[in-house]
C-alpha cells in the first residue's frame, strides 16, 4: 500500500512545481481567503470557484483560471476513478496555464466553503458584465 501512495503522490508532484503549503497563515492562503469578501473580489477581478464540477465547467468554457489549490492530503483517500478525474482536471488546468498549488488539510479548510470539501478550489479572473 505504501508503494501505491508514493506513486500517487509522484503523479501530483509531476503536475505541480511547488511545495505543499502546510501553514494556514501562509500569505497565499490568507490572500485567497480574502476573496470571500465581495469588495475584494470586485477590486481584484478574481473570484473563488469551489468544487470539481464547477472548475471543470470553467475550464471547458475557457475561462481564465489563475490558480488551483488542491488538498494533497485527501488525494490518497479518493477512489481510483476519482483520483483519475482529479488528475485529469489538474492536467487540463495546467495546460491552460493555471498554477497548481498543493495544500495540506488545515490550510485547505481555510479556503474551502463550509463542510463541502471536494479537494479543489480555484481562483479565476472574471469580467463583470455591464447592467
Name what the model sees in each region.
Residues 1-115:
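N-terminal positively charged helical leader segments and presequences
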Residues 115-131:
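Acidic/glycine-rich phosphate/pyrophosphate-binding loops and surrounding catalytic core
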Amino acid at each position: 500500500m505504501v508503494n501505491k501512495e508514493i506513486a500517487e503522490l509522484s503523479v501530483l508532484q509531476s503536475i505541480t512545481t511547488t511545495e505543499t503549503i502546510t501553514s494556514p497563515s501562509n500569505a497565499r492562503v490568507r490572500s485567497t481567503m480574502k476573496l470571500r469578501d465581495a469588495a475584494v473580489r470586485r477590486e481584484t477581478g478574481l473570484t473563488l470557484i469551489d468544487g470539481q464540477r464547477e472548475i471543470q465547467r470553467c475550464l471547458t468554457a475557457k475561462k481564465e483560471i489563475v490558480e488551483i489549490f488542491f488538498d494533497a492530503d485527501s488525494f490518497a483517500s479518493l477512489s481510483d476513478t476519482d483520483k483519475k478525474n482529479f488528475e485529469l482536471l489538474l492536467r487540463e488546468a495546467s495546460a491552460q496555464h493555471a498554477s497548481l498549488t498543493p495544500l495540506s488539510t488545515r490550510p485547505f479548510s481555510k479556503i474551502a466553503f463550509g463542510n463541502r470539501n471536494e479537494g479543489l478550489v480555484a481562483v479565476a479572473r472574471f469580467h463583470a458584465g455591464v447592467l
